[in-house]
Curated annotation (Swiss-Prot):
This is Uncharacterized protein L454. One of its GO terms (cellular component) is virion component. It comes from the Viruses. It is found in: Virion. Residues 8-22 have a biased composition (Basic residues). It comes from Acanthamoeba polyphaga mimivirus.
């Protein structure tokens, strides 16, 4: 760059040619732009793009001549230019070209330049904003808004904060808090919380003669009588006698004082048993049976071991010393300290802690401090190197009059008035004291902030402007109106179309009647808009499945039912009328069609009770035969199961079971139910094989009479084991000993779970345990629990003790305990009153099989039984009633209504299968009349498939009327339709009317609707959706066209048209995305845009992101390529970037800091606390403080010192521009400053609390 005052000869010709054009351009500019109401952006462009304005030189206001860089243009009318300069508005100065107008002397970094100073321009902008009327705040007001008066407005939201105690300005609030905190730590004086004494104003105004200042006068008798008579005239509350306080208590004299308290300690004693009885117990004495008085242990022989010890005994010596929670004082012995040299070298320091490591010596007591006198000598710095081409120094000082002002303590404390922290070359931050009101939330800070794009590199003379959009209040408004495809990955050449549809109110309206062929592949047919009438219930949707359909439960294959079936009110009517050869399978299995002509039963018993002889009733998950429908109604469960045929088996849960004999009479007790088993028949308990009992046995009132008559050599086997018939001739025993004491000598008494022989019944009673056990022979064995035991002798007389019961057990008789083999009892036994009489007389060859075993058939001629025994004992041999989880056939639908569960399941036909839950089930006949129960509801046709959730489902008949129950919803799905559940493939039906339930949403999906992936179907739409919005989620999902693909949550979704109107919910924001656009989520890649945003500013971050109509962020790669924002007629606020992007001249040389003015020193305020802390520090090098004298303020002489002085270097900028690169960062502090103990504001709230108790310290 040429800095010479003379023009270059090589450029004379070109300058001579441009002279006239530049003059006309300058004249034209000032004639056209001297208007107050002009476009600032146009003015800026006119100035910066004008060659003449780029080289204009203006004189400063002080009139000091400066050396300027002469432009190449001559013959400029300077007089006219100066006149126009004085008449133009002041704010035009911000558009002036920045010039190198220094006079050659080094400039201080904090000095205001004439034209190229950033601080001056920023100050001018702030002045124009407030005084020029460009702000909403009144310049005359203090922004108190009338809430408080101006003199009482205090705040700390604009106080600058400095992390260190250096730099410009001070934070008095922080310093005060820190100093009070330190003062309270060392002195205990809580200055922040101490409330000083204040004078209290009198509550009333002073009144003359309100008191006697010279003493109270003497009252006269008239005055005294007047007041005293009035005071004692009424005498209210006085008694005619004196009260005497008496202590409470019972049986006290009139002058006795009670000592037991308020309540008397007297308590009446309860009467004893002898006092209450007519015949006292004290008159009777019992016999004392002496027992064992004591027991001594046998002598212990010495134990000798020869193997080594495998353990270790830990003693106190093995433990290591450790510490306890409470420690005792250390015991110090008396010893002599040897002299060392440490006491001569060690220095003890006292006083407050000091952070600096080089100031340790200053923290000493006052009596140990040095005695010195502050010097008044002036200290000067040596001059800097003067040689420009020095061989040893790389810096030089071209100014002989320059000086250096060192930093002092006063710079930290006084309220200086210089502009703040400014710099030109090494820094790029300008301090500005903002006076606007503080924002309360982050939203207020972000919403009203112009989009300045501060973090942008150099733009190579390309101007930037900022978006002035108005903020949208919600995220939806930000994202739904993005009509220009902002988030597109790269530029696309495809044509876009927009949907002018009106916004829907709900998601259902948006999805259910979508007429657009969106997401359509290339090889897909046309659409069929079906008009189905509204169904009110789920049952009506699925109940009318054709005959050949299958109804498969959840998770299985299911065909469509017949749609002509009428609603059944109960479950029984749904399932009872199944044909003979059909199977009713529970959920998830195959099911056959029932007989539809069955009349409704009132109970479950009537549904299953009429099972024929050779039928099978299979429980849940098994096959079941059809019941016999001619069975009469039973009132109890026993009547349901007792009438099984002779050859039928009643098996417990999980086993095979035959049909019962239905002619059995009712029994009144459990014994009548099980006692009449024939001798050679077997009664097997639950889960085992059981034979039919002898039905001629009379009723025994107790369990003992039922089992006591077992013969000698027979075996009594407990539950789940083989058991023989008892001897029924045994007399009644009165105790347990009589039942078990007649066991012969060589017999064995085995505990529960083992084999047991019959006892000897002729044994006399023993009175104690010894008599019971001492008369056992040598070879007799008493086996403990789980061992072998023989049957007892049933002729034994009652023994009063346990020994008499078990001592005389015969050798060859077996009594088998629980879980062992047991035979059937003799049913001719008379009633036994005890358990022994019930079990002792069991015959030898009879077998009673316990629960879970096989059981033989019963005699069906037995009379009515009243108990469970009578219900189950007389079952036929060959009938099988299969319990739960077994095979079960379908019932006969001609059965009359039953009132109980037994009648419902007993009359099942032979070859009919009723399959429980989880098994196969056939479809019912759809011609059935209305069924009152859920059973009547399941009339599913033959070959239809109904698929459950997550499986394939056929097409439904869309002309079905409304259903009222779930059954009607499930059964009437058309034959070849497929309804896909959540997360699966699903078709769309566009023309369906509004649905009210989820069932209506799922059932009407078209048949062969399969759509390819996004890669195959992208950009193949031909029309738009103009249907009204749906109100439910169901309507949004069910009406998917036949060949379309609807992707579930978390899957790929195609785009909707972006020309939709504003939605009110988030759902409306994402459903109407155009076809060929890709919406990128948060923190993902976004493409560039090709249009402009003319919308107002957004107030939240959400509105900035979602309603970004100016197509993404500015495209700038940092190398000058890219266009950034392209806007038209936008108001561009002044920024630092604006002031730095047009720099074409070099900056001046930087010198030392400019001294502060006399005004700043005169108005300085000294920090007394800070000076007190630095009382004992060493004298500074700056000399004594001479006071605020205009001649002496900040004055320092400087001499040249080539060894220590640094040159005031200059820098040259040729073609590289000085660009502004600000770094914006914010830090949110979640914790209180470590140097503050408590917030004074919190203490103030505590003091204002009326319930706070204040203590004077």
């Amino acid at each position: 760059m040429n800095f010479s005052n003379k023009p270059n000869k090589s450029r004379k010709k070109s300058n001579r040619k441009n002279k006239k054009s530049n003059k006309s351009n300058t004249q034209k500019f000032f004639n056209e732009n001297i208007v107050v109401d002009c476009d600032l952006f146009g003015v800026s462009e006119n100035i910066t793009n004008n060659a003449k304005s780029m080289n204009q030189v203006f004189d400063n206001e002080s009139g000091i001549s400066k050396r300027v860089q002469k432009p190449s243009v001559k013959n400029i009318n300077k007089k006219n230019l100066k006149s126009k300069q004085k008449n133009r508005p002041a704010y035009w100065a911000q558009f002036d070209a920045q010039r190198f107008d220094s006079i050659g002397d080094p400039s201080a970094p904090n000095e205001l330049y004439q034209s190229c100073d950033k601080s001056k321009l920023a100050d001018l902008e702030r002045q124009l904003s407030y005084q020029g009327g460009w702000t909403q705040f009144n310049s005359d007001s203090s922004m108190s808004y009338g809430i408080v008066s101006d003199d009482k407005l205090t705040h700390n939201n604009m106080m600058p904060y400095f992390s260190a105690k250096s730099g410009y300005g001070s934070n008095d609030l922080l310093n005060t808090s820190v100093m009070n905190y330190k003062n309270s730590l060392f002195t205990g004086n809580l200055k922040d919380t101490w409330k000083h004494k204040q004078e209290i104003k009198p509550h009333f105004k002073p009144v003359a003669d309100s008191s006697y200042i010279h003493g109270t006068p003497i009252y006269s008798d008239d005055v005294r009588q007047r007041y005293e008579s009035q005071a004692s005239k009424l005498r209210q509350g006085e008694k005619l006698f004196d009260s005497i306080q008496v202590t409470p208590g019972l049986n006290l004299r009139h002058d006795e004082k009670g000592t037991h308290g308020y309540h008397s300690m007297y308590r009446p004693l309860e009467k004893t048993v002898d006092e209450l009885r007519v015949r006292p117990k004290i008159t009777y004495e019992g016999r004392i049976i002496e027992g064992m008085r004591g027991q001594e242990r046998a002598a212990q022989a010495p134990v000798i071991t020869y193997k080594p010890d495998t353990y270790k005994t830990t003693t106190k010596d093995d433990l290591l010393p450790t510490s306890d929670i409470k420690k005792a004082p250390k015991v110090i012995d008396n010893f002599i300290m040897k002299d060392t040299a440490r006491h001569d070298q060690h220095i003890e320091y006292t006083g407050g802690a000091y952070t600096g490591s080089n100031h340790v010596g200053r923290n000493v007591p006052e009596y140990m401090q040095e005695k010195y006198k502050e010097s008044t000598r002036q200290n000067f710095l040596a001059p800097k190197p003067m040689q420009k081409h020095s061989k040893t120094d790389t810096k030089f000082n071209p100014n002989l009059k320059s000086y250096e002002l060192p930093f002092t303590l006063k710079d930290q404390n006084i309220h200086n008035k210089h502009p703040g922290i400014t710099s030109s070359i090494f820094g790029n931050t300008t301090y500005s004291n903002l006076t606007d009101s503080a924002k309360f939330t982050n939203k207020q800070l972000i919403a009203e902030k112009s989009v300045t794009n501060t973090n942008i590199g150099t733009n190579n003379m390309r101007g930037t402007v900022h978006c002035m959009d108005i903020a949208n209040p919600t995220i939806k408004e930000i994202s739904v109106e993005n009509r220009l495809n902002p988030n597109i990955n790269g530029f696309s050449t495809i044509h876009r179309t927009y949907n002018p549809e009106i916004a829907k109110a709900t998601i259902k309206e948006t999805v259910i009647d979508n007429l657009e062929p969106s997401n359509v592949g290339q090889n897909i047919g046309s659409y069929a808009n079906l008009t189905h009438n509204l169904n009110e219930t789920i049952k009506e949707t699925t109940v009318e499945i054709p005959q050949n359909n299958f109804v498969v439960p959840v998770g299985q294959y299911q065909r469509t039912p017949g749609l002509q079936d009428t609603t059944n009110p109960t479950i029984r009517e749904t399932t009872v009328g199944i044909n003979r050869n059909s199977n009713i399978l529970p959920i998830g299995q195959y099911q056959r069609a029932p007989d539809m002509q069955d009349i409704a039963r009132t109970t479950m018993n009537e549904t299953i009770i009429t099972t024929p002889w050779n039928n099978h009733i299979t429980p849940i998950n098994q096959q079941q035969s059809a019941p016999h429908p001619q069975d009469l109604f039973r009132s109890t469960l026993k009547e349901t199961t007792i009438d099984l045929n002779r050859n039928s088996n009643i098996l417990p849960i999980g086993q095979y079971q035959r049909a019962p004999n239905l002619q059995d009479n009712f029994r009144t007790s459990t014994r009548e139910t099980t006692i009449e088993i024939p001798r050679h028949s077997q009664i097997i308990p639950t889960g085992q094989y059981q034979r039919a009992p002898n039905l001629q046995d009379n009723t025994n009132p107790t369990i003992r009479e039922t089992t006591v008559g077992i013969s000698r050599n027979s075996q009594i086997i407990p539950i789940n084991q083989y058991q023989r018939a008892p001897n029924l001739q045994d007399n009644l025993k009165t105790s347990l000993k009589e039942i078990t004491n007649s066991i012969s000598r060589n017999s064995q008494v085995l505990p529960v779970g083992q084999y047991q022989r019959t006892p000897n019944l002729q044994d006399l009673p023993n009175t104690n345990l010894k008599e019971i056990t001492n008369s056992m022979t040598r070879n007799t064995q008493i086996n403990p629990v789980g061992q072998y035991q023989r049957a007892p002798d049933l002729q034994d007389i009652t023994n009063p003790t346990l020994r008499e019961i078990t001592g005389n057990i015969h050798r060859n008789s077996f009594v088998v305990p629980v879980n062992q083999q047991q035979r059937a009892p003799d049913l001719q036994d008379i009633m036994n009153p005890t358990l022994r009489e019930t079990t002792v007389g069991i015959h030898r060859n009879n077998i009673i099989i316990p629960v879970s075993q096989q059981q033989g058939p019963t005699n069906l001629q037995n009379n009515n039984n009243t108990t469970l025994k009578e219900i189950s004992m007389s079952k036929h041999r060959n009938s099988i009633i299969t319990p739960i989880n077994q095979h079960q056939r379908a019932p006969n639908n001609q059965d009359i209504a039953r009132s109980t569960l037994k009648e419902t399941s007993i009359g099942i036909h032979r070859n009919t299968n009723i399959v429980p839950i989880g098994q196969q089930q056939r479809t019912p006949n759809p011609q059935d009349i209305l069924n009152p129960t859920l059973r009547e509801t399941i009339k599913i046709p033959y070959n239809t498939n109904i698929n459950a959730v997550g499986q394939q489902q056929g097409r439904t008949n869309l002309t079905d009327s409304a259903r009222s129950t779930i059954k009607e919803t499930v059964v009437s799905i058309p034959q070849n339709y497929v309804t896909t559940a959540v997360g699966q493939q699903q078709g769309k039906t566009i023309q369906d009317s509004l649905r009210q339930t989820l069932k209506e949403l799922n059932l009407e999906n078209n048949h062969n609707s399969n759509i390819g992936t996004r890669e195959n179907n992208l950009g193949a739409a031909h029309s738009f959706n103009r249907q009204p919005l749906r109100s439910t989620t169901k309507e949004s999902i069910v009406d998917v066209p036949q060949n379309t693909h609807m992707t579930a949550v978390g899957q790929l979704k195609h785009k909707a048209p972006l020309l939709d109107t504003v939605r009110t919910t988030m759902k409306e924001n994402i459903i109407q995305i155009p076809y060929n656009s890709v919406v990128t989520a948060v923190n993902q890649s976004q493409g560039s845009s090709s249009s402009f945003n003319r919308e107002p500013l957004n107030t939240t971050i959400k509105e900035m992101v979602t309603d970004n109509k100016h197509i993404g962020q500015a495209n700038h790669d940092g190398y000058g390529r890219g266009y950034g924002y392209l806007t038209e007629k936008k108001e561009a606020p002044n920024t630092n970037k604006q002031f730095t992007c047009q720099e074409v001249y070099i900056a001046p040389l930087e010198g030392h800091q400019k001294p502060k003015s006399y005004e700043a020193a005169y108005n300085a305020e000294t920090n007394e606390r800070k000076e007190a802390l630095f009382k004992y520090r060493s004298p500074t090098d700056s000399g004594v403080n001479m006071g605020p004298d205009p001649d002496m303020i900040n004055l320092k002489l400087r001499n040249d010192n080539h060894e220590s002085r640094d040159p005031n270097t200059g820098y040259s900028f040729n073609n590289s521009l000085d660009r502004f690169n600000p770094q914006i960062s914010s830090k949110i502090s979640n914790s209180i400053d470590s140097c503050r103990n408590i917030d004074p504001m919190l203490v103030g709230q505590l003091d204002s609390n009326p319930f706070n108790i204040k203590y004077n310290i």
